[in-house]
Amino acid sequence: NHKSNVKAQMTEWNMQLEAGGEHFQELVNFVREVSMECSPVQFIPDCYDCWGAVYKKGNHTVSHDHWPAIWSWTYYVNVTSECAPLVFTNTDYKVQPYNGLLVMFPGWVKHKVPPQESDHERVMVAGNLNCRSGLF
């Protein structure tokens, strides 16, 4: 395993490049399209990392950001309404996950996941986007 703010079972950082990663690459391509539609300026995004995590009861993520990423994202694969939310630190804003939800936010925004209280696993994929070098 590797050093991470995520205190849950994780894949490698570049799972979209691993064997069988073509399904994750499809998700990354979708995220890239959404980021281009939602960004206030035109840019061509590159996903420089992508990972999966499975949270079991008691697992959590400590508060952190993804600077210098332009966009960070998380996609919920298998969750229930009892699963832990995504919490944006120092705000009252939290997102309760549901299957198929994509959440995108600026990479500098601090966020965390409180301890998972449900017995149901919280399965998600996340990643970071930056501008493809020299292309705006």
Q: What kind of feature is each model-predicted range?
A:
Residues 43-115, 120-124, 128-136:
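Catalytic core of non-heme Fe(II) oxygenases with the double-stranded beta-helix
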Residues 1-42:
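Non-heme Fe(II)/2-oxoglutarate
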